[in-house]
């Protein structure tokens, strides 16, 4: 309760400090949250009572396979509406099924309109729930068991939809960058990767791997972005930009 109170007050401090910033348009309570939906709704309501200029949402990709929209949500941010109704192009193996960028040939017709507003009934992910009512969810880089709520057969959004963390296509390391790390930060990971490749007798192919993986990443991003822009029912997307180490998507 003390931690929750601090986080809620931190939200008010964000509004007070950055509320006038011209780029402060949308406010999400957090990333991939689980918890009390009613409590999240009340928190948003409290923020709106102070500052109504922004668009608010309960979180980004909350409840993963079992998304919902609460009363105070101004938009929805997620990756799917059910196991089959996907709204981005790729998924991790722990978050299957995989997306169209991973499993299909590029298409000039691919879009997410039928996933957002389906013409036909679709399956929900009830098969993933075990006999005790638990389901495995993605948790960090692993999995975690949580109690699954009873699911509705179909979830139709009534607010603008934003696709969450699209992209994430990686490239092979460019070992020529190792010498550029002249400060306190060293490219130890690159050194390990280079040694592994050398041990396998493939170091001479490093540049080709770098070029080929870069070209593949460009094609994947092209397919992903064009599918999103082509979707008339998709209000926008969040392009993940993680650069913890060079080459990460």
Placement of each model-derived feature along the sequence:
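Active-site mouth of glycoside hydrolases
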Residues: 1-75, 79, 156, 237
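Substrate-binding clefts and catalytic carboxylate motifs of secreted carbohydrate-active enzymes
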Residues: 27, 89-249
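Acidic, His- and aromatic-enriched active-site or binding-groove loops in soluble protein domains
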Residues: 76-89
């Amino acid at each position: 309760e003390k931690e929750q109170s601090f986080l809620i007050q931190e939200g008010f401090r964000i509004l007070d400090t950055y509320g006038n910033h011209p780029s402060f348009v949308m406010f999400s309570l957090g990333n991939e949250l689980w918890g009390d939906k009613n409590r999240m709704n009340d928190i948003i309501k409290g923020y709106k009572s102070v500052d109504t200029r922004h668009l608010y949402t309960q979180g980004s990709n909350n409840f993963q396979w079992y998304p919902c929209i609460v009363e105070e949500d101004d938009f929805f941010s997620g990756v799917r509406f059910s196991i089959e109704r996907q709204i981005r192009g790729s998924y991790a193996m722990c978050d299957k099924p995989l997306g169209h960028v991973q499993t299909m040939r590029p298409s000039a017709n691919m879009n997410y309109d039928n996933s957002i507003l389906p013409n036909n009934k679709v399956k929900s992910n009830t098969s993933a729930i075990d006999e005790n009512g638990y389901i495995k969810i993605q948790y960090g880089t692993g999995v975690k068991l949580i109690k699954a709520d009873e699911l509705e057969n179909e979830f139709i959004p009534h607010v603008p939809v934003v696709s969450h963390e699209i992209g994430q296509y990686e490239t092979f390391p460019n070992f020529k960058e190792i010498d550029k790390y002249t400060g306190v930060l060293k490219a130890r990971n690159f050194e390990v990767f280079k040694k592994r490749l050398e041990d396998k007798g493939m170091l001479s192919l490093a540049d080709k791997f770098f070029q080929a993986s870069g070209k593949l990443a460009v094609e994947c991003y092209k397919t992903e972005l064009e599918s999103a822009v082509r979707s008339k029912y998709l209000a926008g997307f969040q392009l993940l930009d993680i650069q913890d180490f060079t080459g990460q998507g």
